[in-house]
Amino acid sequence: MQTATKTPWDFLSKYKDIDFSCEWPTVPEMFFITTKRFPERPCFTDFEGEGGSKNTLSYSQVEQKLKELASWLTEKGIQKGDRIAVSGKNSPQWGLVFLASLAAGATICPIDYALHEEEIKNLLNTAKPKFFFVDEEKFPTFDAQNAEYKVYSLSPKFPEKYVYSLKPNSIEHDFQSAKEDDLAAILLQAEQQEIQKA
């Protein structure tokens, strides 16, 4: 008698047709499933607390912030397939923008934060995002531009445009989340020449 081989993803069958409908869950769907399974486990940690102290957010705390930001993006007109760019240091805020953009149905365009501002501008011209979330060192430069995209901060140093300060009028529960065959991300890179490509 042959026994079925267990795989690391066997647990997904419990969530099929409830939390996802395609063959595999998308990144936001997988995040929501993980939150159901481990709501109080640590999800994101940073060291930006008082005196460099550690600040940890649980999956359920990040899920709340994700739903707030995805709802805010939807209220601001983001539709399935619109592009949102993000450039910054590794941080919970960066991860939140990535996940919330996908949950809102947008295509995320991460841009290497180590690039010079002119290189980032060229990549933004190629990507044509509706929103650009950027870290504190480069925020003033991009916020001062008269660009077609709106600029928001990954840093609390700019509270009026800080990602955690962006609150929706109401929280959506049915997001236009991308499906498994939809374009989720465009990885932009600067080449040796002046041409930028997606």
Residue ranges and their predicted role:
Residues A4-L12, M30-L57:
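AMP-dependent adenylate-forming
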Residues W9, G51, E137-L183:
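ANL superfamily adenylate-forming
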Residues E23, E40-S91, G95-L99, H116-K121:
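Conserved AMP-binding/adenylate-forming core of the ANL superfamily
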Residues P39-P42, S170-I195:
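Conserved pre-ATP/AMP-binding loop-to-beta segment of ANL
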Residues I84, S101, F132, L183, ...:
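Conserved S/T- and glycine-rich ATP-binding loop of Class I adenylate-forming
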Residues F98-A104, T126:
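Short hydrophobic alpha-helices that are characteristic scaffold elements of the AMP-binding
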Residues Y113-D143:
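Conserved ATP-dependent adenylate/AMP-binding module captured primarily in the ANL superfamily
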